[in-house]
Amino acid sequence: MIRKRLIIVAGGTGGHIFPGLAIANNMITQGWDVRWLGTKNRIEADLVPKHGITTYFLSIYGYGLHGKKQKILAIVSILQAVLQSYYIMRKWRPDIVLGMGGYISGPCGLAAWMCKIPLVIHEQNRVTGLTNYYLSKFAKKVLQAFPSVFPNANVVGNPIRKEILAVIEPSLRLCNRTGPIRILVIGGSQGSKIINQILPVVAAQLAGKYVFWHQVGKGALKEVQQVYTSMLKNQLNYKLVEFIDDIAIAYAWADVVICRSGALTISEIAAVGLPAIFVPFMHKDRHQYWNALPLEQLGAAKILEQPNFTAEKVSQILMSWDRSKLFTMAQRARTIAMVDSTERVTSELIELANNTKH
């Protein structure tokens, strides 16, 4: 029997890559041959091959470069990426191409259309990205994590890694927990400057009553460590790391999360059941704000946009949440979790492949 073939296109940030990996691993268990298109200078270059997935790296720059020369280079690199991905698809002939959003999906989606290979796109945010907006015009299927982003698109959630889904539910994890309240701080895989600046002050204000596990981002450890040391002196109520390798362990440890509100982060926090303070990344479409809003409306989280993100406000919010309140918030977060998202996406891909004539 000839194995069905899938190319997944995802790169740049964990929010695109980790859902893609969840889908890839699930499709492999279904007997599919899966390959990956990404970029060689971002985290997928290290992460994806570790899963045993054949990975092709495209030479491409983002759309948002400034300056005439940089914009010309970006256009040239996009055209080059179209040709590279076209060649790969013509040679390997996948049954489906799945784009997970981000700028790399643009040229690869165009190449799939040129090769007459069915294209499926997945929109992770509550506000559609520019690339997916254009790709939706000729994609065979449009999948979305949240309702109402695209009219008539199927809602499938954001695929989540199995180890995160395996975290014990709040009723067993949190109900009898005692001791200092545990604060998990995540600025994304690349870190967040404002979170790194504010949290040492918060840790100093709350010393003795709270403990902190802070992911500072690549290259920021030494600088942030110096700030914590100067603020907390001999206090040992914090742990700093550049990157948390096993985020499921961190989620299971935490009572509260302070983080950005990327779509995948929102989905993971809901699936685990964790209260949160969200600090949306400032973008003109405010997509991270809209991602976080349903959890705030449920009473499961608090949103502090960057102009309002101060040590005083963070400390005030944390001190107003006792363990009983945190347990209630955690249970509320779980009510909007879509824990079968990976299976939903897998089902959509298999259905399309079975209904496509070659």
From Swiss-Prot:
It comes from the Bacteria. GO terms for cellular component: plasma membrane. Pathway: Cell wall biogenesis; peptidoglycan biosynthesis. One of its GO terms (biological process) is lipid glycosylation. Disulfide bonds: none annotated. The keyword Cell wall biogenesis/degradation applies. It is an enzyme of class 2 (transferase). GO terms for molecular function: UDP-N-acetyl-D-glucosamine:N-acetylmuramoyl-L-alanyl-D-glutamyl-meso-2,6-diaminopimelyl-D-alanyl-D-alanine-diphosphoundecaprenol 4-beta-N-acetylglucosaminlytransferase activity; undecaprenyldiphospho-muramoylpentapeptide beta-N-acetylglucosaminyltransferase activity. Keywords: Cell cycle, Cell division, Cell membrane, Cell shape, Cell wall biogenesis/degradation, Glycosyltransferase, Membrane, Peptidoglycan synthesis, Transferase. Pfam families: Glyco_tran_28_C, Glyco_transf_28. Its EC number is 2.4.1.227. It is found in: Cell membrane. Its main location: membrane. UDP-N-acetyl-alpha-D-glucosamine binds at T13, G14, G15, N125, R161, S189, I244, Q288. InterPro entries: GlcNAc_MurG, Glyco_trans_28_C, GlycoTrans_28_N. It catalyses: di-trans,octa-cis-undecaprenyl diphospho-N-acetyl-alpha-D-muramoyl-L-alanyl-D-glutamyl-meso-2,6-diaminopimeloyl-D-alanyl-D-alanine + UDP-N-acetyl-alpha-D-glucosamine = di-trans,octa-cis-undecaprenyl diphospho-[N-acetyl-alpha-D-glucosaminyl-(1->4)]-N-acetyl-alpha-D-muramoyl-L-alanyl-D-glutamyl-meso-2,6-diaminopimeloyl-D-alanyl-D-alanine + UDP + H(+). It is a peripheral membrane protein. NCBIfam families: murG. Cell wall formation. Catalyzes the transfer of a GlcNAc subunit on undecaprenyl-pyrophosphoryl-MurNAc-pentapeptide (lipid intermediate I) to form undecaprenyl-pyrophosphoryl-MurNAc-(pentapeptide)GlcNAc (lipid intermediate II). Belongs to the glycosyltransferase 28 family. MurG subfamily. This is UDP-N-acetylglucosamine--N-acetylmuramyl-(pentapeptide) pyrophosphoryl-undecaprenol N-acetylglucosamine transferase. The gene is murG.
